[in-house]
Amino acid sequence: MLTRAQKEQLVKELSEVFKNSSLILFSDYKGLNVAQITDLRKKLREKLADGARYKVIKNSVAYLALKEAGYNVEEIEDVFSGPLAILYVEDGDPIEAIKVIYDFSKEMKGIPSFKGLYLDGKFFSADEVENLSKLPSKEQLLAMVVSGVQGPIRGLVNVLSGTLKNLLYALNAIKDKKSE
């Protein structure tokens, strides 16, 4: 059992973590054993190294830490009923973390169940977790942008090189005609 001072320190530490997190996902871990939670954490580490954490946190501690971090906890009070585990991402792609926990939940037949999440400070309901898990990762989005920009540039290069080739052919034809 934690003393009041320890709880206050924990709230302070968690509020700092939540301030720096791009993703805070709330889930009900009921039905998962320690080995399964460890497996989920391992999968998160494989994708995001130490940038993501999945922790079982007491409801009152999570509530106070989020409130201290500046989140509007009154709008999400139903999140703080029942068992609570929080996935937060301080460093790395939050969409990748959502994909990992969503795939794990599908694999475990809906466990852990989702209660909602904050993504870059905006709250999304539990129903939207599936849609967010289908979004491309930051790396994929950057690749799409690069290929989108690269296409017209390649076209311009091809047009210019084609024009230069045609000019070269014309000059060669003139040279051949004059040499005859």
UniProtKB/Swiss-Prot annotation:
Keywords associated with the record: Ribonucleoprotein, Ribosomal protein, RNA-binding, rRNA-binding
CC per GO annotation: large ribosomal subunit
GO MF entries: large ribosomal subunit rRNA binding; structural constituent of ribosome
InterPro entries: Ribosomal_uL10, Ribosomal_uL10-like_sf, Ribosomal_uL10_bac, Ribosomal_uL10_bac_type, Ribosomal_uL10_CS_bac
GO biological process, one term: translation
Highest taxon of source: Bacteria
Xref: Gene3D superfamilies: 3.30.70.1730, 6.10.250.290
CDD domains linked to this entry: Ribosomal_L10
Keyword RNA-binding among record annotations: yes
Family: Belongs to the universal ribosomal protein uL10 family.
NCBIfam families recorded: PRK00099.1-1
Quaternary structure and partners: Part of the ribosomal stalk of the 50S ribosomal subunit. The N-terminus interacts with L11 and the large rRNA to form the base of the stalk. The C-terminus forms an elongated spine to which L12 dimers bind in a sequential fashion forming a multimeric L10(L12)X complex.
Functional note: Forms part of the ribosomal stalk, playing a central role in the interaction of the ribosome with GTP-bound translation factors.
Designated name of the protein: Large ribosomal subunit protein uL10
Species whose genome carries this gene: Thermosipho africanus (strain TCF52B)
Upper lineage: Bacteria, Thermotogati, Thermotogota, Thermotogae, Thermotogales
Annotated gene: rplJ
